[in-house]
């Protein structure tokens, strides 16, 4: 297994620990930062192979070195160095401008930063420096990884295909794919044409009689850029619950940041500023579906799917409309949250169908919300890196232990029906 991520972070360390606990040889860990600094995938791989050449490569009698390489991309989100490099890669004067994996490449980024300026960005707690340019750079990095893997690792398999990861990361494209596949999702505000700013959002909410919506930054994570927004159709009064904080300045544009906690806004100036900023970078609005509750609190389910099997699941319980573990939502098992086995089976089936809409990918965390009225399941998000779940077991295994057991060489060599595909075969 070749993991491309951030060496030593919780994800790559969790994978290595799981492999060690199972008696498997360590994975090869390649660094996003070094790749973005200009080193080739081949050079990075050669260095790591030399360091691991003395390690045994046999597991359960299988020579793992004889298996086709399995490429796993991890989240780049825990490193500001990587974030800054991706913003630079997304610059209009960047050298590598392969936008083939960007779902909306033709849409210009607002006030783009040149490469030199991007490299000078300073880390500021929670600040969202340039989300749309970051995403453009991310898609360019994915395209480069895909190209170089074809050359360096012929016959390799992607656990999650880079094109699918790009699509999952952009909520606009992900929800479109799910809808086209017949997967139930919250109804978009403007199915043919999404709003483009605060004014068009309010106009569409009133004309479609959808007075409560969730507005999302298309490529936000950890609840950043999410707004639970209500508009009174008669008085025009409005309320926005969001993690977005604002710092205003006299001589330069405001700074928007993820405050890490929910804030309540009722003044039009602040609300319109936040919403306009989100739509400039890429926004998505959908019907606000009241979630099923437990002891007066709302919850949804993060359901992990690994190679067409729904496994680990956790209920994210909150006293607010926004349920996210980064907001310190209470964690429960679905049973503890009061879900019947029938509803749990519906959640699992919905999650399986959601990942099947991305047939070149094998692992994702699916956020499933259950309507408090009809108890119908809806897919709110498909997270290609949604397997970082602590203290959740399935058949006695943690998430990474389960994935490593399923992804042994024997599994993906002898079961061609799995979503794992050969690099370049799509």
Residue ranges and their predicted role:
Residues 7-8, 34, 192, 219, ...:
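Short, flexible loop/turn elements at secondary-structure junctions
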Residues 19, 283, 361-364:
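PAS/PAS-like sensory domains
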Residues 1-2:
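Extreme N-terminal starter segment of soluble prokaryotic enzymes
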Residues 18-22, 54-69, 315-358:
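C-terminal or late-domain output modules
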Residues 6-18, 27-192, 196-199:
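Conserved N-proximal alpha/beta basic substrate-recognition cap immediately N-terminal to
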Residues 302, 367-369:
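Short, surface-exposed charged micro-motifs
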Residues 325-363, 370-426:
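C-terminal active-site "lid" helix and adjoining low-complexity regulatory extension at the edge
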Residues 205-324:
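Phosphate-binding site of ATP-dependent enzymes
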